[in-house]
C-alpha cells in the first residue's frame, strides 16, 4: 500500500497516523500534503512545522493533495482536515481513485455523510473510518464472552469513557469551533459504535443530557450521557467524561444478559488498571484478555492491504453520525428523538 496524509493541521492525528504507518509491513508511507494551510498555524497546532514532520517520518512534503497522489502514485490517503471539510475532500480525492481513511469525527451533517457514501460508490473506492474501541483488548474480551454465550443475549449495556479534557486544545485550535462538532460528535462516536457492536442491534430512540461543569472556556459540553433504546427492546447508555482532571479509568462497562453480567472495572489503586470479569451462576471470575487484537486506531491498514471487508465503513459511520446528531438534538431540546428506520 502506497499511502500519504492529506492535511497536517491537527493536534493528534498526523502524529498518531505517522507513528502507526511508519515501518508497518506492506505499507509505504511516502508523503504528506499541507493542503495549502498556513505553516505557522500547522506548527502551532501540531507542534511541528510541515518540514519537521516530513523529516521525522522521512517522507516527501507537498502543498496540494492531488500532486501528492499523482507524483507518488498513491493508492491510499489518510484525510486530516476540519470535520466540516471531509465530504469536500473525499469527493476530490475519490476522483483520483485512491482509498481513503477518515479519522473521526466522520462528518458534521447528515448531508455530508451521504455525499461520502455516494462518492465511494460512484468512483469505486473504499472509505474506512476509525478509530474503534471495539479493538481494545478489554472490549475484545467482552465481545468474545458474548459470542461464547456466557450471559445469553444481552439486554442492557452501560459504558463509561473518561477522555481527559478539552484543555489540551489551544484556544485557536479549530477543534474548538462549534461548526466542527466538538466532543458531542467526537466522543459520542466511541460509545455509539460500542453499543451497536456489543448489543448486535440498531438504535430506535435516543435521549441525552449534556452539560458544561468544569470547562468555562469551552463552547461544548464536558460531561454527558446518551441513553439508547434498541430496536429489539434492550437499552444502552454511554457516559462521556471530558471533565476529569484526575487519574481515572479510561473505560468502564457493564453488559447484562439473562445468565449474568460481564464488566470492565477498576482493579486496585492504579487508575489505569482494569479487569474484565463475569458474574454468573458460578459466582465471580476474571476473564482473560485476547493475546492479540488489531490496533484500535490502525486496524483498517491490514484490511486495505489484504483486501478484507472493512470493519467500519462509510455507511456504518453515517449511521453512527445520525445517532450522534440525534443525541445532540435531544440534549438541546430535552426530548426523546426517534431514529428513522
Which stretches of residues belong to each language-model region?
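N-terminal Rossmann-like dinucleotide-binding module
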Residues: 1-53
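C-terminal helix-rich "cap/oligomerization" subdomain common to oxidoreductases
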Residues: 26, 76-79, 303-341
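Active-site loop of classical SDR/Rossmann-like NAD(P)-dependent oxidoreductases
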Residues: 40-44, 286-298
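Predominantly a Rossmann-like dinucleotide-binding segment in NAD(P)-dependent oxidoreductases
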Residues: 9, 133-218, 334
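Short acidic low-complexity segments
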Residues: 60-70
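Beta-strand-loop-alpha-helix segment that lines the small-molecule cofactor/substrate pocket
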Residues: 75-76, 82-83, 87-134, 149
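Hydrophobic residues in well-ordered beta-strands that form the structural core
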Residues: 63, 102, 127-129, 238, ...
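Contiguous beta-strand/loop segments that form the cofactor/metal-binding neighborhood of enzyme cores
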Residues: 186, 192-269, 297-309
